[in-house]
Amino acid sequence: MCLTTSEPPFPDTDTPTMRSASYHIKHKSKTQTHLRILNLTRRRRLLKEQKEMEMRNLKLFVENQSIIRENEALKKKALLLHHENNALFALLHPKYSPVSTSLLQ
């Protein structure tokens, strides 16, 4: 038995093959915890974005309803103005001009 070899009598405990099972469990646990945190963070971000989108959608819906009501009111005003315009035009240019009484005498 030769003790002057360059290899140590016991293998290096830092190599992956010689690490303890508790190290692997701890490392796996840290990885799982990290992934769980990432998943929760992503889920919170997605929920926040979803709420923001719903709020934006609601605001746009309310604004759209307001525009529709305003449009209907303007249509009614335009129709009334059109009728008034027709009435005034009829007064200005009657279909049958009255016969002048001076011509009949």
Swiss-Prot record:
Region of interest (Disordered), residue spans: 1-20
Induced by what? Up-regulated in response to increased HD-ZIPIII activity. Up-regulated by REV.
* Coiled-coil ranges from the UniProt annotation: 39-60
Assembly and oligomerization: Interacts with REV.
Which purpose does this protein serve, as stated in its record? Competitive inhibitor of the HD-ZIPIII transcription factors in shoot apical meristem (SAM) development. Acts by forming non-functional heterodimers. Part of a negative feedback loop. Essential for proper functioning of stem cells in the SAM.
State what protein this is by name: Protein LITTLE ZIPPER 2
Write the record's keywords in alphabetical order, separated by commas.
Answer: Coiled coil, Transcription, Transcription regulation
Q: Can you name the source organism? A: Arabidopsis thaliana (Mouse-ear cress)
The positions making up the signal sequence are: none
Q: State which residue ranges cross the membrane.
A: none
Tell me the name of the encoding gene: ZPR2
